[in-house]
Structures are given as C-alpha cells and as structure tokens.
C-alpha cells in the first residue's frame, strides 16, 4: 500500500493519511527509507520530484513523526542538492517535534562545512529564525568579511530569499523569532547596505 501511494501523481491518495494515522511507525519507516535513498542518490542542481517533494508539499500530517529522523539525517550528511535541503528543512522547521535548540545546533554545525554562497545563506536563515540576536550579529560580521562587493550583494539577496520566500514554489518554513520590530529593523538596514536598488531583482 505504501509503495502504491508514493507513486501517485500530484501528492498522495486521500486514504494515505488515514493509513499513516492507523500505522504511523510502519508508514514512517517506509517513508524514511525512501527519502534516505532519494538523498543518497541526489544529483546537485537536479530536482528529483519523488517522495521528498510530496512529503514537503502535502504531507504535513506526517511532519512531526518524521522530523526527528530527518534532523538526524541532516546532522550526519552534507547535502549537495539545494532542492533536497530546502525540502528537508521545510519539514524539520515546520514540525513541532524539532526544537529551536535543535535548529541552532544544526545551523551552527552546517555553517562550518558549507562551501557555497547559497548553502551558507540557507544556514544563516535557519539560525536567524530561531536565535536572531546572535545570528544577525554573526551575519553582519560574515557579510563584512566578504571581500567582493558583488559577492556581498549575492549573499545578501540569497539570504533574504531563504529567510522569506524559500526556493522554488514552496514557501519557507523558517521560524519567526526574528519577526520583531527590533530585529526586522536590523535586518532591513543590513540588507540595505549590501543590496543596491539597481541590483535588486
């Protein structure tokens, strides 16, 4: 039944959430196994359009059950596909079973190993969402340390996109601890420093 359900076009069949509700451990084990295989075979820059996409976009009923294992997956592996990373983070950040402290630990670990502007920006966005005071201060230092003005602008624009819009058609699930007048003002002034009006698309 699980294998049939995951090959449904455009999400899951209407009976699949009920199957999950009745047998959460069995269904979760199957879904996690499929997602792990999907991530293991990922190709950078290519969207797989398989189970992870469906769980991320229409499987909110399973997020709380799946998120702790997906957090572990993120901690143990350095993903190279930004599409997959965004979908995993959407599930993990959107769940109630992963704490803000979990995300602080995850972002702190992954920022050290991230090696592209996009991936570093993704992890800063995760951090700002849960610990804005420290994260915005670190973000300010990171931007000022970038020697190229063009790369500063690229990083700032990528960060804002990850914080507020996400990648592709799915909205971000970055947590909202930064949504206070004080932190929004800091972010606005910081982004205004590096994103010039003629470059903002």
Q: Model-flagged regions — what are they?
A:
Residues 1-201:
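Non-catalytic all-alpha helical scaffold/repeat segments
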């Amino acid at each position: 039944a699980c294998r049939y359900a995951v090959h449904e076009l455009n999400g899951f069949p209407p009976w699949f959430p009920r199957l999950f509700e009745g047998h959460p451990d069995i269904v979760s084990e199957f879904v996690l196994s499929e997602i792990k295989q999907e991530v293991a075979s990922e190709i950078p820059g290519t969207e797989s359009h398989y189970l992870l996409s469906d769980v991320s976009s229409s499987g909110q009923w399973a997020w709380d059950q799946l998120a702790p294992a997906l957090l572990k997956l993120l901690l143990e592996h350095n993903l190279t596909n930004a599409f997959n990373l965004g979908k995993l983070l959407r599930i993990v950040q959107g769940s109630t079973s992963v704490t803000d402290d979990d995300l602080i630990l995850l972002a702190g670990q992954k920022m050290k190993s991230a090696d592209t502007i996009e991936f570093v920006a993704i992890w800063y966005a995760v951090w700002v969402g849960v610990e804005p005071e420290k994260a915005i201060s670190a973000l300010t230092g990171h931007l000022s340390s970038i020697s190229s003005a063009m790369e500063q602008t690229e990083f700032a624009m990528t960060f804002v996109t990850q914080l507020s819009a996400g990648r592709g058609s799915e909205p971000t699930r970055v947590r909202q601890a930064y949504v206070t007048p004080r932190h929004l003002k800091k972010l606005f002034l910081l982004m205004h420093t590096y994103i010039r009006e003629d470059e903002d698309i």
